[in-house]
Amino acid sequence: DRSLVLCCDEKSQCQALERTQPGLPLGPHRVRTGTHDYIRHGTITLFAALSYLDGKIFRQTAERHTHTEWLDFIKHLEKQTPAGLTLHLIIDNYATHKHPKVKSWLKWCNQRHHKQHGVDRMVMHFTPTSSSWMNLVERFFRDLTVDCVRDGSFTSIDDLVASIETYLTERDLAPKPY
């Protein structure tokens, strides 16, 4: 009743690749082309939480994907969602999700929230090993890759992040559940 289900994961190794020359467009009897040569400008990790109910995306980017960045992300979720709700996080079995510092913060957060609202704040639900396909946020990552990242040419990490933010801002205008 007072719960929000969020399908969470991180997309690591989002590469800022700058193509060395533009591809040729589609034409009669010609498929679209693209060069395989590129300049690599670095990578980022995109942390995302997809609301199971309405398709809204909570997100944050980071240079790495350790337990520290994961903890920053779930703290971000805690601040971005209404107090009084229990957040049910659907996540995979990646070690960063089970790190002692993450568990310690979750325990503290749940104790504090329980005192104020009578319910835990965050409950982790782990998908079975090798079953990441069960987590709906993976479908979102596929769409992001196909629609925004794969064919893009990015001159910097900032350019890649701006492109992802533009894509997500447009998507947020009419979010949809999967």
Which residues does each PLM region occupy?
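RNase H-like two-metal-ion nuclease catalytic core shared by retroviral integrases
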Residues: 44, 92, 119-146, 158
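Acidic/histidine-rich, metal-coordinating catalytic segments
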Residues: 85-98, 127
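Active-site proximal helix-loop segment of RNase H-like, two-metal nucleases, encompassing DDE(D)
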Residues: 57, 137-156, 170-172
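Mobile genetic element proteins and their domesticated derivatives, centered on retroelements
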Residues: 7-9, 49, 55, 74, ...
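RNase H-like polynucleotidyl transferase catalytic core
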Residues: 33-38, 109-136, 152-154
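Extended, low-complexity cationic-aromatic segments
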Residues: 1-75
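Short, basic/hydrophobic alpha-helical segments
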Residues: 68-88
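Charged, gly/pro-enriched flexible loop segments at helix/strand junctions
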Residues: 172-178
